[in-house]
Regions:
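Residue-level signal for well-ordered alpha-helical scaffold segments within enzymatic catalytic domains
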Residues: 2, 54, 97-100
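Residues at helix-coil transition
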Residues: 5, 57, 102-103
Length: 109
């Protein structure tokens, strides 16, 4: 919030906060100050995602009717074996990639 108050645009890591109220305050402040406030969701910039997006834009893969995505972390690693680790660490990337290729979500099954 110091950077926003100083007039800076902000690119941050996820999660923007461990507290929903605090996160919303940051988003609201950025809107009030007309500053960009973005979360670095870098999976859309991987080589595979870039190629797939090019194919999509060039019409090589047709219309997407359904999207499904799974991410995982390799072998067991004790520091990753914490409550909700996968949810916090990977699901934001899944949601971003799904929206990158499919647009805003209309329906969830």
């Amino acid at each position: 919030m110091q950077a926003l108050n100083a007039g800076c645009h902000v690119l941050t890591e996820k999660p923007i906060s461990n507290n929903l109220k605090h996160g919303q305050e940051m988003v609201d402040l950025a809107k009030k100050l007309d500053r960009c406030f973005a979360v670095d969701l870098n999976h859309r910039f991987t080589p595979a995602a870039r190629v797939a997006k090019k194919w999509q834009n060039d019409g090589l893969i047709g219309d997407l009717l359904f999207l499904n995505m799974a991410l995982w972390i390799g072998r067991f690693q004790p520091h990753f074996d914490t409550e909700f680790y996968h949810l916090k660490a990977l699901n934001p990337h899944s949601c971003d990639i799904l929206r990158y290729f499919g647009g805003d979500v209309d329906q969830v099954h």
